[in-house]
Design a protein with these regions (language model features):
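Extended, histidine- and acidic-residue-enriched regions that form the cofactor-binding/catalytic faces
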Residues: 3-117
Length: 117
């Protein structure tokens, strides 16, 4: 039965990132926490490293007003996310920061997969 052979691994790409790398990535703006990093410094920096042609810096906005919630609720209240979808600023993003992130987590993610599969 395939159910007996299937294996699923759930991991966040940022979990193996050392604290000192987080400090380097966020040396210009405060680290807002992973819940707020959607379309912010880390994800934008990764896109600048992987596919810079897809990053439109002129569209970056500074967002204010999103507040952390210690739980999840569905459906998500309409006022929980600003209209831009951005929860934290991306203004200090760079391809160099993206490469720093890649270099710090990729090998660790491969090790996790090698161990489990």
């Amino acid at each position: 039965c395939i159910r007996d052979r299937a294996k699923i691994l759930i991991a966040n790409w940022w979990d193996p990132m050392p604290a000192e790398i987080i400090d380097k990535v966020f040396d210009e703006v405060p680290f807002p926490g992973w819940a707020f990093e959607h379309a912010a410094v880390t994800e934008t920096s990764l896109m600048m490293a992987f596919a810079p042609e897809l990053v439109h810096e002129e569209r970056m906005v500074d967002t204010q007003g999103a507040t952390p919630c210690p739980y999840h609720i569905y459906p998500v209240p309409k006022d929980a996310v600003p209209p831009t979808g951005v929860l934290a600023p991306a203004r200090s993003s760079s391809a160099a920061r993206g490469q720093l992130i890649i270099d710090s987590v990729l090998d660790e993610l491969v090790k996790i997969c090698d161990k489990e599969f």
